[in-house]
From Swiss-Prot:
Record-level Gene Ontology MF annotations: mRNA binding; structural constituent of ribosome
Source organism superkingdom: Archaea
Subunit-structure text: Part of the 50S ribosomal subunit.
Gene3D superfamilies per record: Ribosomal protein L13
Keyword vocabulary terms for this entry: Ribonucleoprotein, Ribosomal protein
Family: Belongs to the universal ribosomal protein uL13 family.
Function according to Swiss-Prot or TrEMBL: This protein is one of the early assembly proteins of the 50S ribosomal subunit, although it is not seen to bind rRNA by itself. It is important during the early stages of 50S assembly.
Coiled-coil regions listed in the entry: none
Keyword Ribosomal protein: yes
Protein name as annotated: Large ribosomal subunit protein uL13
Pfam families per UniProt: Ribosomal_L13
InterPro entries: Ribosomal_uL13, Ribosomal_uL13_bac-type, Ribosomal_uL13_euk/arc, Ribosomal_uL13_sf
GO CC terms: cytosolic large ribosomal subunit
């Protein structure tokens, strides 16, 4: 089992790395999901996720999909799923091998640290985005 630290890691780069490991057969745990970062304008990122969450259908608003998550671990899981062929059996098996954690559980030693100091001032953490969307974690 490989433990990946997501602190200060760009979400897309983290997701592609984790997806490639999962497709090769590794079991992966991603810790500190709330500290991963999304680069770009903060207002634009917030506006994009609010727009995705508030989409409704005229015929039946409760059944309109796709449903977008609020919690940081689920947001990161959704981004990783986008890097996998999740509609095929190979992608389903790879997606089952990925676990996402908020914080670091007790007794877990970190194997891979993908984060570095952000080299831009335009970024938002997944935790800030989750709190803006109304998550309680």
């Amino acid at each position: 089992m490989v433990v990946v630290n997501a602190e200060n890691a760009v979400v897309g780069r983290l997701a592609s790395y984790v997806a490639k490991l999962a497709l090769s057969g590794e079991e992966i745990t991603v810790v500190n999901a709330e500290k991963a970062i999304m680069t770009g304008n903060k207002e634009y990122i917030f506006q994009k996720y609010v727009q995705l969450r508030t989409r409704k259908s005229i015929s039946n608003p409760k059944k309109m999909g796709p449903k977008y998550p609020r919690r940081p671990d689920d947001i990161v899981r959704r981004v990783i799923r986008g890097m996998l062929p999740y509609k095929k059996p190979r992608g389903v098996e790879a997606f089952k091998k990925i676990k996402i954690e908020v914080g670091v559980p007790e007794g877990v030693s970190i194997d891979i640290n993908l984060g570095s100091a952000p080299n831009t001032i335009k970024y938002v953490t997944v935790g800030e985005l989750s709190q803006f969307l109304g998550a309680k974690f």
